[in-house]
């Protein structure tokens, strides 16, 4: 069990400083932070299971939260704890208020010194995004880390609820999670009998990449009545080339690009005039933050995707 109160392991911190992992200014900042927390430790009774299957417990609701990925930032705000966020990372652009919060680096490299000076009492880490060594260093400083990375619809709702538990904002967080579940269930019911549409969803351009059916985006394609042409591949995010897409000849090509208005990835396919998706003008843009971030806004992104597939059905 991990505890969030400022329950500190001083020996671990001193070891980090002495072996160089927390040297220099970071070491000084870390030691100052630790000394400020050397109060009698007690196990907390506010607990939640994270996505690494560890139970994280706090002695009191989190008041100073650091969210170390754009998705984590959105989820904390969705949980009703946006007013507690004291640190984010690059590209944490939603909600707009998050852009005013102090940045502590990016998803792949955290500025630990700056993070420590902000004195978070809870850090939200991204399972496959943040460097594990840095998250372990944060924990060794006595700062609890809650690992998240939703991989399905229920995982998104559950993440919001668990974060709300840790922040003491259950009323708002549970409401958001419930609305998300209900909205996704309504979409699933509406498109349950829809005629299948073959879909290529592009998540990257160089190298060309898609998703399989286990990926959250693949699940959304299926919910909308789409058939993912690469759904049965073993890799979650397979690398491809133009030739395999041409051979599969999807009825729809959907992509998000690198930004909300970047549609360049779709124009690339227009050179292949024999593609069914090109012949029928079924090249669709979906704002990436609405479907490529596992947050409650996925409901809006899925609705857009479903509407695009319905347009494709009407063009047969």
Question: At which residue positions do the language-model features occur?
Answer:
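His/Asp/Glu-enriched short active-site or ligand-binding loop at hydrolase and phosphoryl-transfer sites
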Residues: 89, 214-237, 257, 284-285
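Short helices/loops that flank or line small-molecule/ion binding pockets
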Residues: 112-119, 141, 240-249
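Cleavable N-terminal signal peptides
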Residues: 30-32, 42
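Extracytoplasmic substrate-binding proteins
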Residues: 45-48, 54-55, 121-122, 126, ...
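A short, structured surface patch at a secondary-structure boundary
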Residues: 63-118, 122-128, 229
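Short helix-initiation/N-cap motifs at beta->coil->alpha
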Residues: 51-53, 104-113, 129, 233-242
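N-terminal secretory signal peptides that target proteins for export/translocation
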Residues: 1-22
């Amino acid at each position: 069990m991990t505890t969030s109160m400022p329950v500190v392991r001083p020996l671990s911190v001193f070891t980090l400083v002495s072996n160089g992992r927390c040297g220099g200014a970071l070491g000084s900042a870390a030691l100052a932070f630790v000394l400020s927390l050397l109060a009698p430790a007690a196990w907390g009774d506010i607990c939640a299971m994270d996505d690494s299957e560890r139970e994280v417990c706090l002695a009191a609701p989190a008041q100073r939260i650091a969210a170390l990925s754009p998705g984590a930032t959105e989820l904390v705000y969705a949980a009703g704890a946006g007013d507690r966020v004291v640190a984010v990372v690059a590209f944490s652009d939603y909600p707009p208020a998050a852009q005013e919060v102090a940045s502590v680096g990016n998803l792949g490299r955290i500025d630990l010194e700056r993070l420590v000076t902000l004195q978070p009492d809870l850090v939200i880490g991204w399972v496959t995004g943040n460097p594990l060594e840095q998250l372990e260093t944060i924990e060794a400083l006595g700062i609890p880390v809650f690992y998240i990375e939703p991989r399905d619809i229920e995982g998104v709702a559950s993440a919001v609820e668990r974060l709300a538990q840790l922040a003491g904002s259950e009323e708002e967080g549970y409401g958001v999670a419930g609305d998300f579940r209900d909205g996704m269930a309504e979409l699933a019911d509406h498109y349950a009998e829809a005629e299948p549409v073959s879909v290529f969803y592009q998540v990257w351009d160089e190298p060309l990449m898609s998703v399989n059916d286990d990926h959250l985006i693949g699940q959304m394609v299926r919910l909308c009545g789409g058939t993912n042409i690469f759904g049965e591949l073993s890799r979650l995010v397979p690398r491809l080339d133009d030739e395999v897409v041409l051979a599969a000849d999807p009825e729809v090509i959907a992509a998000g690009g690198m930004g909300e208005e970047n549609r360049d990835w779709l124009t690339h396919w227009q050179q292949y005039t024999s593609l069914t998706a090109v012949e029928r003008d079924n090249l669709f843009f979906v704002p990436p933050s609405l479907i490529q971030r596992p947050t409650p806004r996925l409901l809006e992104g899925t609705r857009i995707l479903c509407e695009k597939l319905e347009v494709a059905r009407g063009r047969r």
